[in-house]
Amino acid sequence: MRLILLSSLLLLGIFLANGHEEDPDGKVLNSLIDTLMHLQKLYANLKYSFLTVHRARSFGSGSERLYVTNKEIKNFEALRQICEQAEGHIPSPQLENQNKAFANVLERHGKEAYLVVGDSANFTNWAAGEPNKAAGTCVKADTHGSWHSASCDDNLLVVCEFYFIL
């Protein structure tokens, strides 16, 4: 909304800078009002479209988090850099439905992927016999969403997590 107001002020400033100091018939002002109303409608439509997609994605996955792959296969450090550049995060499912949404991506691609498990995690989905520090200091999820210890040098499917917080 602020962007719309700033755009209107910019249009007015351009008009005044071009030497049009007067607007006796109110044509310029009316034009600015029309433009502002049009921009407000565009903003409302964009917001509605975004929220519709957000609700659909959340409904379909049961999660307010979106797990996306670029289909690359990389080690943990490369994954960290890729997710950071995309302004996302390494997956860190905090709830069962989030883990299921993450596992759906892995199952669809038939690949395993890294995830991060916090020290104070309320939800975990370790496979039997895990965690096993001898296998490595990283954690990967299999195509069923079960978690396993892994080497951080393993090349796994790149999956980043994005939050929908409104």
Curated annotation (Swiss-Prot):
Q: In which tissues is it expressed?
A: Expressed by the liver.
Q: Provide the primary localization.
A: secreted
Where in or outside the cell it occurs: the entry states: Secreted
> Which residues does the UniProt record annotate as the domain C-type lectin?
46-161
Q: Which residues form a coiled coil?
A: none
Q: Which residues form the signal peptide?
A: 1-19
> Could you tell me which cysteines form disulfide bridges?
C83-C160, C138-C152
The UniProt keywords, alphabetically, are: Calcium, Disulfide bond, Glycoprotein, Lectin, Phospholipase A2 inhibitor, Secreted, Signal
Q: Report the function annotation for this chain.
A: This phospholipase A2 inhibitor binds directly phospholipase A2 in the presence or absence of calcium.
What subunit structure does UniProt give? Homotrimer; non-covalently linked.
**Family membership noted in the UniProt record:** Belongs to the alpha-type phospholipase A2 inhibitor family.
Identify this protein by name.
Phospholipase A2 inhibitor clone 10
What are the leading ranks of the lineage? Answer: Eukaryota, Metazoa, Chordata, Craniata, Vertebrata
